[in-house]
């Protein structure tokens, strides 16, 4: 299996990819380096495919990878309570149904100008 090292140890690389994948699912668009964008594309595609399956085993597999972060918080005036949605709930309830008719290719990578400071090639990765 080929992958990019991204200048990190394996545990650091896996943690970074989990964080970036979760951020992309929450925000639906992030700015990162080209190499990182190409690497997280693989995991995001797998997570959305799990979301499309939608069964309990797929939900548990996705929960083992996606961080438990709050995606959105809403205030309900009637009950005077805040309700929050996690990244996993957003994946299964909002993102996966959007791609029900699409077989792969859920992300788009747009190259942008190099980063100031070290001229690293930058890219925007977003959900289509």
UniProtKB/Swiss-Prot annotation:
One Gene Ontology MF term: structural constituent of ribosome
Keyword Ribonucleoprotein: yes
Cystine residue pairs: none
SUPFAM superfamilies, alphabetized: Prokaryotic ribosomal protein L17 (SSF64263)
Subunit structure, interactors included: Part of the 50S ribosomal subunit. Contacts protein L32.
Similarity annotation: Belongs to the bacterial ribosomal protein bL17 family.
PANTHER family: LARGE RIBOSOMAL SUBUNIT PROTEIN BL17M, RIBOSOMAL PROTEIN L17
Protein name per Swiss-Prot or TrEMBL: Large ribosomal subunit protein bL17
